[in-house]
Amino acid sequence: MNREAILWKNINSIPEEPDLIKSLEVLSMEQNDRERELEHNLILNKQISEQIPEWIIPDSLSELSSGIDLNFVLEEQEVNDNNSQPSLEEEVVSESDVESMRSFNVAMNRGEVGESSNKRPKREPDLFTSFGKIREDIGDKNPSLNILNLDCVNSPSDRKNKIDKWAAELGLVFLTNPEAYTTAPNAARARLAYMEHKSLGIVNRFIKSTQWTQMNGDILLNVVSGLYTMFLGEDYTGNQEKTLEQERAKASLRLINLQLCDICSLQSFFCDYESNLYKLPQNEYPSLVKQYLAKIPIVGEKASKRFEEEASAATSYSLGFAHKLVNEELAKICELSKKQKKLKRFNKNCCSTFEKPYEYGCKPSYSKKKKYSKKYKPKYTKYKVIRKKKKFSPGKYFKPKDKKSEKAKYCPKGKKTCRCWVCNIEGHYANECPNRQTSEKFKLIQIAENYGLEPIENPYEDQQEICLLEQIQLSSSDSELDDTCEESSSEESE
């Protein structure tokens, strides 16, 4: 029987003592570490053999155990553990030691100790540069990655990924150890104990507080279904087909909408396309692979032709084969571009040394380059360049009125504001005056009309008008009127 199966079979008979808890910790180790610990740890084998009669000590340790007193080894280990613990007694420091330490610190701050240079010391070369790179490739450094802990994990997708990864790992452990987890009488108890050991926080409390042994079916499937219900709010058995259909619909839509515009982003595009391709059924792979080649710019057409010629019945389903053809065509284009760059730097004068001549003793004909005369154009012009208008815009033929200038006097239509010459009242003209028949001034106007004169529309200032009217009013005879008319005519000519 397997050594691990014996441990799980008698796990309930092992008392919970600090020395024997080591046996339970060994079961939670990785397979290589677990085998190494069970094969080379003599003390652990002795302790297990005292509790489990079926336990067999390996041959490599049986000879060694006969010549070594186990009690002496245990006592020596306890002494070493006690010596490794720090003592609680504090060392008494004298005042002279304190003064010496203080002076040393002051000297260090002033730079008096050691070299006086303020430069930072050079870093020593790393002699093991590749050690870190090698260690990165050796498994997971964190041993708690395979332990399920959903405390403060808020994202439902993260919770689902953690539960699925945990369930897949446990299923592999149970499948590879059937003697302990499948065919053993207490296989269900062993599985449950292993799941409790591989969980923390709220998941561990949920597993311990539920009566899983009273349920029918596989205990691992029941636990995973319970985790889906409690921490994701989903039915694990009922929603699997529904969620699978939704994922397929999203993947199909994304494959249609994906585009590649820059050929330098080919690897990211391929990764996204590949991750969604394998969510769909296999009978759709050939058409989706051709669709991938059609989305590739520059080299997609050549790669698709090669795919139709070279693809077999098996490789027609392979997206990796199509991606390989695309990379090969890209490599050809890159090599051609490198050659073109080299040809630009190639000196053509050396071609005559490699070619056989057709003429001997003839003068070489040099082709002259045709010269083109170009009219000199000064950089700066003295005159302003007048640009033609592209569209018609009417010019401005009127300028705004000057607010300071006096307004021209005229009688607008409607209400008249000019003053009458007969009655000297605003609101009407002299020919419309109601007092024109009785007024003496109207008679003077009639006399002026008889001499061929007519009234004008205020061409003079107010003072000149008043003076002219006064002269007309004061004249009582025709001779005086003639004199005033001659004076007014002379003023107009002036």
From Swiss-Prot:
The principal localisation class reads virion
Q: Name its cellular compartments.
A: Virion; Host nucleus
An example of a Gene Ontology BP annotation on this entry? viral penetration into host nucleus
Q: Name one GO cellular component term.
A: T=7 icosahedral viral capsid
Please give the SUPFAM superfamilies that the UniProt record associates with this protein: Retrovirus zinc finger-like domains
* Acidic residues bias spans: 479-494
Which Pfam families does the record cross-reference, listed alphabetically?
A: Caulimovir_coat_dom (PF22909)
**What are the protein's UniProt keywords?**
Capsid protein, Host nucleus, Metal-binding, T=7 icosahedral capsid protein, Viral penetration into host nucleus, Virion, Virus entry into host cell, Zinc, Zinc-finger
Zn-finger (CCHC-type) intervals are 418-435
Q: Name one GO molecular function term.
A: nucleic acid binding
Locate the region Disordered: 474-494
Family designation: Belongs to the caulimoviridae capsid protein family.
> In UniProt terms, what function does this protein have?
Self assembles to form an icosahedral capsid, about 50 nm in diameter, nm, composed of 420 subunits of the viral capsid protein. The capsid encapsulates the genomic dsDNA. Following virus entry into host cell, provides nuclear import of the viral genome. Virus particles do not enter the nucleus, but dock at the nuclear membrane through the interaction with host importins.
Q: Which protein, by its recorded name, is this?
A: Probable capsid protein
Question: What organism is listed for this UniProt entry?
Answer: Carnation etched ring virus
The organism that produces this protein has a lineage beginning with: Viruses, Riboviria, Pararnavirae, Artverviricota, Revtraviricetes
